[in-house]
């Protein structure tokens, strides 16, 4: 019997080793999907089902708050919003989180922002959507989806600004991580997102009582058994359909990470999984690696004035990447992603794409950064006497979806390596909306 038990334990140990040997990312997580991302570059460090379309619940509000901060541009003083009938009564029967806003109430913008963030107020989210959506919640939702498109995200569609579950309201862990990256660039957002202290909302024209909003995320409360000191800011979410969702910004020893988990069945599962993911990432990714420019160049035609003006040069800029221990600059390749032509008056969409080939040490994935464009000023000066059409007069070739990618497999460790340049033409497929996965 003892020999049988010993053999069984040995077999189980070998099985566990085999299961974990080829995987990139921590074992023993229960969440349906997760994504760990470098907050600075957007490089994915570890993931599971990161593109699966799931109900987000209240982490939806990251986009809502980001757009409100974008509109305000840090100017909150003296800005008051008036609560509409729809802000309040569209939530009737939902039994959802709120801050007891009343129709006709005049609410300072700052109070609406903190109420939506800290108290996860759905009425506050509606009010903010009207603020950046031209006066209607529907306009706010349209703005949210427009921002999704602007960020190039393919697995997100919003139907409301607060996150109450619906079949046409979904996102993915990867998309939500990118939404938070974008939101962190908006004036004032990080201040709101990282606030830990209780927030006090003074009485208003129709509410005579003072309202208090306190932090609910136990992973940010020092007295909690689930406390994680590295987490600087977070948004939690829950509905019966979505279960538990979570997005956070964490920082340790100068490394800034975004962690997203979705569809954790139990609250304690979420706590344990987030700790596991952050412990894994901070232990494995301890510092940044500077990759200088590899001197990779390409050319793009400039169109204006009814014809081609000439060409400009595009170069890879170099990048600072978060690489796992054991992964080096020699494991990174770079390519250029260029439009067929650049039309004056549009944004020059020229990118360097850095791909990490991490093997079993790091998620093999890519990150796009703006490339360096030179020669445009000289080209414009050479055509100074010519009446130049702008984007409104010339149809960009990019609308056909054609890209030219000039790729270079570069090895940093071999300075004199042969450079292999190849031109690849590919069509960008039109995105089709996918059905929600339950």
Residue ranges and their predicted role:
Residues 90-93, 430-436:
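Boundary segments of small protein-protein interaction reader/adaptor domains
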Residues 21-174, 178-187:
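Active-site-adjacent loops and short helices of periplasmic peptidoglycan-processing enzymes
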């Amino acid at each position: 019997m003892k020999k049988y038990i010993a053999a069984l334990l040995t077999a189980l140990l070998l099985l566990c080793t085999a299961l974990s040997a080829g995987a990139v990312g921590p074992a023993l997580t229960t969440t349906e999907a997760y994504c760990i991302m470098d907050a600075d570059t957007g490089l994915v460090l570890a993931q599971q089902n990161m593109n699966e379309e799931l109900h987000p619940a209240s982490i939806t509000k990251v986009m809502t708050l980001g757009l409100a901060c974008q509109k305000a541009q840090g100017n909150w003083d003296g800005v008051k919003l008036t609560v509409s009938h729809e802000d309040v009564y569209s939530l009737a029967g939902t039994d959802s989180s709120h801050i007891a806003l009343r129709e006709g109430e005049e609410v300072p913008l700052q109070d609406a922002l903190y109420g939506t963030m800290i108290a996860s107020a759905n009425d506050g989210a509606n009010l903010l959507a009207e603020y950046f959506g031209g006066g209607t919640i529907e306009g706010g939702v349209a703005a949210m989806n427009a921002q999704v498109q602007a960020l190039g995200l393919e697995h997100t569609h919003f139907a409301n600004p607060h996150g109450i579950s619906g079949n046409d309201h979904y996102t993915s862990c990867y998309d939500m991580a990118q939404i938070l990256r974008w939101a962190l660039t908006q004036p004032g957002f990080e201040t709101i997102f990282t606030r830990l202290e209780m927030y006090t909302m003074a009485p208003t024209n129709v509410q005579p009582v003072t309202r208090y909003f306190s932090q609910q995320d136990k992973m940010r409360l020092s007295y909690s058994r689930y406390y994680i000191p590295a987490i600087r800011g977070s948004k939690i979410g829950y509905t019966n359909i979505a279960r538990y969702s979570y997005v956070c910004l964490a920082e340790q020893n100068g490394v800034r990470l975004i962690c997203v988990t979705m569809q954790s069945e139990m609250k304690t599962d979420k706590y344990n999984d987030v700790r596991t993911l952050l412990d894994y990432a901070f232990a494995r990714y301890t510092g940044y690696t500077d990759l200088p420019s590899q001197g990779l160049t390409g050319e793009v035609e400039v169109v204006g004035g009814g014809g081609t003006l000439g060409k400009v040069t595009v170069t890879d800029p170099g990048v600072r990447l978060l690489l796992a221990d054991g992964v080096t600059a020699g494991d990174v390749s770079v390519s250029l992603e260029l439009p067929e032509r650049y039309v004056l008056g549009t944004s020059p969409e020229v990118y360097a794409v850095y791909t990490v080939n991490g093997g079993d040490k790091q998620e093999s994935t890519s990150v796009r950064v703006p490339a360096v464009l030179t020669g445009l000023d000289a080209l414009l000066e050479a055509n100074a006497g010519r009446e130049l059409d702008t984007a409104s007069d010339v149809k960009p070739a990019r609308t056909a979806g054609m890209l030219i990618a000039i790729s270079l497999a570069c090895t940093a460790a071999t300075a004199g390596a042969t450079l292999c340049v190849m031109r690849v033409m590919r069509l960008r497929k039109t995105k089709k909306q996918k059905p929600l996965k339950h």
